[in-house]
C-alpha cells in the first residue's frame, strides 16, 4: 500500500498514524528523496527532534520534540544489514546513515518507530533516502528511476523476508553458540 505524506510539520504524523490505524501493516517502509548524488541511504536512527521550515513556509520549528513524552531516539527495526547487502549485490550504491536529520524525513521515521513501540507491537519501521533523479540542466547526477525503483523493491523484499523469520529469544541464541 503506497501513501504519500505531505512535507508539513505534524500533518505528516497525523496522516501516518491514520494510515497505520486503517491498514494495520506489519511493516512501514518510508522513502524520502535525499541528495543529488548516490548512494541510497539506509537510515538507522530516528531522533525526537525537528527543526526547520516545512513546505508551506508557515511553520519553522527549532529543535522541537516530535513526541514530548517520547524517548530521545529509536533505532530502525528493519534488517538494515540484509538490505545493505542486497543493494550492494544488485550493484546499487548504498550506505548506512545514522540519523535522518531534523526534517520531515526524520519526523516520519521517528513517528513510525514511536507508534510501533507504543501502539502497534510487532510492526517494523524504517526509512531510506533515495537520490534525486538525474537533471543535467541543474547539474544533478542523481540515480535513474529504474535503479531507484529497484532499490525500493529490494528493501521491501528484505524487510518482508525478515518478517517471516522466527524470532529467537536470547536463550535460544545462546544455546546455538
Task: Please provide the spans of the model-predicted regions.
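N-terminal catalytic or cofactor-binding beta/alpha core of small enzyme domains
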Residues: 1-102, 113-122, 142-177
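Active-site glycine-rich loop that binds ribose-phosphate moieties when present
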Residues: 105, 109-111
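Short coil-to-beta-strand
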Residues: 123-127
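An accessory alpha-helical subdomain
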Residues: 129-134
Amino acid at each position: 500500500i503506497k501513501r504519500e505524506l505531505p512535507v508539513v510539520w505534524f500533518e505528516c504524523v497525523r496522516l501516518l498514524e491514520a494510515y497505520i490505524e486503517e491498514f494495520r501493516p506489519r511493516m512501514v517502509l518510508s522513502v524520502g528523496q535525499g541528495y543529488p548524488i548516490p548512494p541510497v541511504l539506509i537510515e538507522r536512527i530516528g531522533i525526537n527532534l525537528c527543526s526547520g521550515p516545512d513546505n508551506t513556509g508557515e511553520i519553522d520549528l527549532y529543535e522541537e520534540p516530535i513526541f514530548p513524552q517520547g524517548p530521545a531516539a529509536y533505532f530502525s527495526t528493519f534488517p538494515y544489514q540484509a538490505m545493505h547487502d542486497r543493494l550492494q549485490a544488485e550493484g546499487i550504491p548504498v550506505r548506512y546513515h545514522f540519523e535522518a536529520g531534523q526534517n520531515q524525513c526524520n519526523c516520519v521515521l521517528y513517528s513510525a518507530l514511536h507508534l510501533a513501540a507504543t501502539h502497534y507491537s510487532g510492526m517494523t519501521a524504517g526509512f531510506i533516502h533515495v537520490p534525486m533523479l538525474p537533471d543535467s540542466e541543474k547539474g544533478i547526477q542523481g540515480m535513474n528511476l529504474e535503479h531507484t525503483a529497484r532499490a525500493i523493491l529490494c528493501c521491501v523484499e528484505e524487510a518482508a523476508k525478515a518478517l517471516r523469520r522466527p524470532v529467537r529469544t536470547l536463550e535460544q541464541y545462546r544455546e546455538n553458540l
